[in-house]
């Protein structure tokens, strides 16, 4: 009987330790519902998901670093740099203070998207080279990359004619792509939520159904054991 009590007590402690954040979050939600019953309205959840979608997509990328038992301080700054470049390419042609007045027609959305991806890949390749080839700690490498990305963003925005100013007045094609929604009767599902859901599905498949994903978990769990097992930890 004493053994069973100790086992139950241990399980309870383990449960609280593993799910403390979820319990606290649940209690916070209950308090908010009591204070503001309108919190449970479906439209409110749609708004929350919409605002969280961009951060969620960023979090999926950072999660890859966590799986590898690493860290990335530069993700936010790299995102900002990508956003600045892509935003400058989708400004409305009727906006007099646009960054590129020589662009007289709306560019295909694939171009700013490709520019963002290339910038992100370049910075991440720099991080990867520093960690894998130079054997530097990910914290130090990403700290430096963070500074470089922020500096590059400031220089880019300041290069506008007349000096630095906010990038605004985007074309309708871009606004519809970002702020549009999929309508089913009276129900509207913002595109941002769909983009996040698709990204999450892709990442889930990569992590759980591919050799790459399994190797990532192996390296994150035990780098030396993964290397002995034949996993190319540098690649």
Q: Where are these predicted regions, by residue range?
A:
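Membrane-helix/interface signature in polytopic inner-membrane proteins
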Residues: 201-235
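Transmembrane helix-bundle core of multi-pass membrane transporters
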Residues: 134, 139-210
């Amino acid at each position: 009987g004493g053994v069973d009590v100790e086992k139950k007590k241990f399980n309870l402690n383990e449960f609280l330790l593993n799910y403390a954040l979820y319990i606290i979050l649940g209690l916070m939600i209950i308090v908010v519902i009591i204070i503001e019953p309108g919190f449970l309205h479906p439209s409110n959840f749609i708004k929350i998901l919409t605002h969280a979608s961009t951060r969620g997509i960023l979090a999926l990328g950072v999660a890859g670093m966590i799986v590898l038992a690493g860290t990335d301080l530069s993700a936010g700054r790299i995102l900002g740099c990508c956003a600045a470049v892509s935003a400058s390419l989708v400004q409305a042609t009727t906006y007099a203070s646009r960054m590129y007045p020589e662009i007289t027609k709306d560019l295909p959305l694939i171009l700013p998207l490709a520019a963002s991806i290339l910038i992100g890949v370049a910075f991440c390749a720099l991080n990867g080279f520093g960690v894998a080839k130079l054997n530097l700690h990910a914290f130090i490498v990403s700290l430096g990359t963070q500074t470089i990305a922020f500096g590059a963003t400031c220089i880019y925005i300041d290069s506008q004619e007349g000096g630095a100013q906010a990038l605004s007045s985007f074309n309708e094609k871009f606004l519809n792509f970002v702020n549009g929604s999929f309508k089913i009767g009276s129900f509207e599902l913002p595109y941002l939520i769909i983009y996040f859901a698709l990204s999450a599905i892709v990442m889930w498949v990569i992590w759980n159904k591919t050799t790459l994903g399994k190797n990532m978990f192996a390296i994150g769990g035990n780098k030396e054991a993964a290397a002995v097992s034949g996993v190319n930890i540098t690649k």
